[in-house]
Amino acid sequence: MRPWLLALLLLAAGAAALAAGLSWTVRRRDLVRRPEERRVGFGFRKTLLIYQPSNRGRVNAIAWELARTLARAGHTVTLNVPSPVLTYDPAEYDLLVFGGSAYLGSVGRPLKDYLASLRFRGKQVLLFVVGDLERAPEMAGLRLCVPAGNQVRSIKIRPDEGKKLCQFAQASV
């Protein structure tokens, strides 16, 4: 076989593998998971924390760290993943928190769809995105899902900056 033909075949195989990997990542990002409500803390303020789990579990750990921090600050935190079957009424909560991982410039479709389906006004909303890149185009897409008339604060953190998110949340509430 000629060297240039072999190089061309290897290049095509590599491109196909990359495309398959990206497709797999996007499908995993947009996977609707089974809801499983957890409660953390017994405070006077009520917080709803909905997060899109990440493929590697980093966001799960960050969400739990944030829930424990808010509980220590006097919140009862209801923790769950986004799903069309959730029936939470945002009016019952003092703080609404939504977050997830950034993949290819966007957060998971289930989180955006769930957030866009909610109707609420006059609420304190905290958005967080976990990703490795400094730029945050995914935050703009997530912010567009929040109805007008709410106080929205947002932050993008790296996977190892859970404490930074917790400090941000404490300063925001």
Predicted regions and their residues:
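Short acidic active-site motifs
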Residues: 84-88
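FMN-binding flavodoxin-like domain, especially the glycine-rich phosphate-binding loop
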Residues: 2-47, 58-78, 90-173
